[in-house]
Swiss-Prot record:
It is found in: Nucleus, Nucleolus. The keyword Hydrolase does not apply. InterPro entries: ARM-type_fold, Sda1, SDA1_C, SDA1_MD, SDA1_N. Residues 725-735 have a biased composition (Basic residues). One of its GO terms (cellular component) is nucleolus. Residues 227-282 form a coiled coil. Keywords: Coiled coil, Nucleus, Protein transport, Ribosome biogenesis, Transport. The lineage of its organism: Eukaryota, Amoebozoa, Evosea, Eumycetozoa, Dictyostelia. It comes from the Eukaryota. This is Protein SDA1 homolog. PANTHER family: HSDA/SDA1-RELATED (PTHR12730), PROTEIN SDA1 HOMOLOG (PTHR12730:SF0). Belongs to the SDA1 family. Disulfide bonds: none annotated.
Length: 756
């Protein structure tokens, strides 16, 4: 070539365009790199700028010359592995980026590179660790994008599990973060990964312990979700709000074609958003269910909790994790409840959180004798007249949560005392006490005093400890057969009003009464409006009247015969015998009819049972049908309690106990007054709306991200010569002296008004 190329970036560009034409230049740079590498291996120095440029150039053009650069990836990986602690941080990152570039072009084996990157986690270089972490997660995700590569995953998992027990705490923590991220992205979503992560709670490093606890406690709602997940959540919320607005407008306003179209479109958008969310959360089970030997694991973790010297915030996280294990796997850790009892004081830090942990650890297999002291302690310290209203409300709500899971934990005397708080003036206390009363009134009214049990309340039966209620078939299966309830649910989901058959029947009955009242005027005129159905009904009525007339004639004949029988005693005795025989025959006929009716009722009931059993045994219910049964049950409860279906559904979703049986501390607080703000908080809130409210427009104008308007450019930046012919300038120059005086006076008057 005639010209000498000095810039490596320019040479890189030209080499990619025509590799054969620039092969001599490439070989020259490659020889230069080899000499620099030998010098660098003997004595790594700070003068690495030229060497890093050569490495970057060769990593970009290695695709063009695969034979000549076959040893280049191994040389860079060996240099990083042997001299990682002696290299400069910037050079380490350049070498790592070059390896990533070659791995993306399939010039480096994946297992070899990932094993090297995991070893580089030991280096005290935070930017390098973040670079390696992001690449490892992305590389494994792309490998398993189309289908699971089980062989590769097994090899990487085994290597990563050994890194969990590495001497370097930084490497162990980064390996743990990689596994958590891969599990959260549904890439390594298996029991092996979960059980390796679960061993992090026994680590002596506090950071590893807290990371593991956060994983198990917030697996369904991570602390820092991805931007894509946030966008999808916002999109689903926006679609749900839009559907509610359109359905309300359609239900309340006039039924126009445009509103119907907009409602249908909003329904389609909401369905798409829900499908995206369901596809994203396809494996929809928490990691806590995949732990091996949960009883032994929980006992071991409780021993760690008793002996630990961690901060109190970390200890209550361990308590929360143990309580979730106890509830999910129905464990018996009886030492855990007396351990919690010593924290049950109103002045205890994070007491609401601890009460939620206690209520969450209760289930039907826990011995009530273990929970009764806890309930008595809560009633003693939280539910008394000396405590504040917020404390009493929290105590009552906690007792209700415990009793909803283990109703035998409270005795009737204490229950009778607690329900008396419903007469208090404080709203939170009254609502909490009424909630406790309503729970026992709906489920176990026999535990309440007689005057509080209510009417038509059936006791579902308070089972003894260790007994379970065995259900036959699927609960609520009969609701799928209820046509009216299904039609009402379809109408609600479509955003339309539903008119029940009862209303139509009542309307028809009312119309019938009106017709009877109006027929007293003119029978002839009204007879013209009689329909064919009315004619048929009239014919049936005439037949019934004829039969009744015949019965009356027979009764009159019998009465005449009886009157004639009084004339002779012999005839009377004979007829009396006949009457007795007639009465006996009638009684026998009635008994036979009743016996015929009873078997038919039994047969119909047996048929209904057989039909239910057949649908349970033969037909496999789909997920959609199970979801519909749940919706129908909610709608039925809403109709019985005179509530709106939307409110019942929303309450069911917002209730913390319905999400994997968890209890949130906010659920125990109930209705409470808003806390009064302090002075500094009020000042800060008042200043929020004042930012940029004062000063000139130029100072308040956003300097970044916005361009100036043409009007502003014409006013400030335009040369005056170009504005001589404008209307504004010519108007000023052509003004008379009188007009100028008037304008000056108005200007001075405006200034004076502005001063005062």
């Amino acid at each position: 070539m005639g010209t000498r190329i000095l810039d490596l970036l320019q040479l890189q560009n030209l080499t990619k365009r025509d590799p054969s034409a620039y092969k001599e230049e490439f070989l020259l740079q490659y020889q230069h790199y080899l000499t620099q590498l030998q010098i660098f291996q003997l004595k790594p120095t700070k003068e690495f700028k030229h060497f890093s440029q050569l490495v970057s150039y060769l990593s970009h053009v290695c695709v063009c010359y695969p034979k000549e650069l076959s040893e280049f990836p191994k040389q860079i990986s060996d240099l990083l592995e042997n001299n990682c602690n002696n290299l400069e941080p910037e050079l380490r990152r350049i070498l790592a980026k070059s390896l990533i570039l070659m791995r993306n072009r399939n010039l480096l084996p994946q297992i070899q590179m990932l094993s090297l990157f995991f070893k580089l986690f030991r280096v005290h270089d935070k930017p390098l660790r973040s670079l390696l972490y992001s690449h490892i997660v992305a590389d494994i995700k792309n490998t398993n994008l189309k289908q699971k590569n089980q062989k590769l995953n097994r090899t990487l998992q085994n290597f990563m599990f050994t890194m969990m027990n590495d001497d370097s705490e930084i490497a162990s923590k980064m390996s743990l973060k990689v596994m958590i991220e891969l599990f959260r992205k549904k890439i390594w979503h298996d029991t092996k990964t979960v059980n390796v992560i679960s061993n992090g709670v026994f680590s002596k490093n506090s950071k590893i312990l807290i990371t593991t606890l956060n994983f198990f406690l917030h697996i369904d709602n991570p602390d820092k979700p991805d931007e894509e997940e946030e966008d999808e959540a916002v999109k689903e919320k926006r679609a749900k709000d839009n559907f509610r607005k359109k359905s309300l407008a359609h239900r309340v306003g006039k039924k126009t074609k445009g509103r119907i179209t907009r409602l249908a479109k909003s329904k389609v958008d909401l369905k798409k958003a829900k499908q995206e969310e369901d596809n994203k959360l396809q494996p929809n089970f928490p990691a806590i269910e995949l732990i091996h030997d949960p009883q032994g694991y929980c006992d071991k973790l409780f021993n760690v909790l008793v002996k630990t010297t961690e901060k109190f915030e970390t200890r209550i996280m361990i308590m929360n994790f143990i309580s979730r294990l106890i509830y999910v796997h129905k464990l018996m850790v009886y030492n855990f409840y007396p351990f919690l009892q010593k924290y049950l004081q109103p002045h205890q830090k994070n007491i609401t959180y601890l009460l939620a942990v206690l209520a969450q650890s209760c289930h039907e297999l826990v011995d009530p004798d273990v929970l009764k002291p806890l309930v008595m302690t809560i009633a003693k310290y939280f539910v008394n007249d000396g405590c504040g209203s917020d404390v009493i409300a929290i105590g009552l709500n906690t007792i209700r949560s415990i009793c909803s899971r283990c109703p035998l934990a409270i005795d009737t005397v204490l229950l009778a005392d607690l329900i008396q708080y419903r007469e208090k003036k404080e709203k939170g206390v009254a609502m909490a006490s009424k909630s406790l009363l309503q729970f026992f009134k709906d489920n176990y009214p026999s535990m309440l005093p007689k005057k509080e049990r209510g009417k038509n309340k059936t006791d579902i039966g308070l089972l003894a400890f260790g007994h379970q209620k065995v259900s036959q078939g699927i609960d609520g299966l009969d609701l799928l057969m209820d046509e009216e309830l299904n039609a009402r649910l379809d109408a609600i989901e479509a955003g339309e009003e539903f008119e029940s058959d009862d209303d139509s029947d009542s309307d028809s009955d009312d119309e019938g009464w009106e017709d009877v009242n109006t027929t007293t005027a003119d029978d002839d005129n009204n007879s013209e409006w009689v329909s064919d159905d009315d004619d048929e009904e009239g014919e049936e009525d005439e037949e019934v009247e004829d039969e009744e007339d015949e019965e009356e004639v027979d009764e009159e004949e019998l009465e005449d015969d009886e009157e004639g029988d009084w004339e002779s005693g012999e005839e009377i005795e004979g007829d009396d015998d006949d009457d007795e025989e007639w009465e006996e025959v009638e009684e026998e006929v009635e008994e036979e009819e009743e016996e015929e009716i009873k078997p038919t009722k039994k047969k119909s009931q047996q048929k209904e049972k057989v039909e239910v059993l057949r649908t349970d045994d033969i037909k496999v219910l789909t997920d959609e049908e199970l979801i519909r049964i749940r919706k129908l049950r909610i709608l039925k409860e809403a109709r019985e309690n005179n509530k709106q279906y939307e409110d019942m559904d929303q309450d069911d979703d917002e209730n913390g106990e319905n999400v994997h049986g968890l209890i949130r501390p906010e659920d125990l607080q109930g209705a409470h007054k808003k806390k009064k703000e302090e002075k500094l908080e009020r000042i800060a809130r008042a200043k929020e709306g004042r930012d940029g409210g004062y000063g000139s427009k130029a100072s308040r104008r956003d300097k970044t991200g916005k361009s100036t308007t043409n009007e502003y450019k014409a006013k400030v930046t335009k040369p005056f010569v170009l504005t001589l012919k404008t209307k504004k300038v010519r108007g000023k120059s052509l003004k008379s002296f009188r007009d100028k005086q008037i304008g000056q006076r108005e200007h001075s008057a405006r200034q004076k008004r502005g001063r005062h």
